[in-house]
Amino acid sequence: MTYGTHNHSPARARALAFAAPALALAFLTAAAPAAASERWATLQAIHLLENPFDTARPGSLGELGAYQFREGTWKMYTSAPFELATDRRVSDAVAIKHYEWLKAELERRGFEVTPFRIALAWNGGVGAAVARHPAPTAVDYANRAANLAADLSRRELAYAK
């Protein structure tokens, strides 16, 4: 018996060549909803920590909206007036842009993107998310957000069944 050799017939090779693009497309489209679902759960967890009752009242540092954006962060992603941070639809759109920027920064720096690390960056900045010893308050926030995101994801899966 010979090990390590492959006997690929021309017919099998053609079938694999034909199927490969379809399999790749199936993989990519299956991964996209999972990534969007994780993003949704993470952002919803952040919202629940930041402003669970959707109050329009500014935070102690002038933060506004569901995600308690500071004006400088808001202006990184939109030219819309900062007051629109209290509009959940507008705030959600900006939150997605901020999430994607944080995700890209973490990936660029070689870090795995997880709900914990996104929340750590959201609360303490990218520097906190890549630091060896981030502030305990930021770690606590990130742990709470990651736990909430995991719970939201479990509930979403349970409803889907």
Task: Label each region the model flagged.
Residues Y3-A20:
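Bacterial N-terminal signal peptides that target proteins for export
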Residues A19-A30:
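Bacterial N-terminal signal peptides
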Residues A32-A36:
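Sec/Tat signal peptide C-region and signal peptidase I cleavage site
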Residues E38-D54, A95-I96, I118-V126:
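Short, functionally critical alpha-helical segments immediately adjacent to catalytic or ligand/cofactor-binding
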Residues E38-L43, L61-L64, V113-P115:
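Extracytoplasmic
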Residues V113-K161:
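Catalytic and substrate-binding regions of cell-wall glycan-acting enzymes that process beta-1,4-linked
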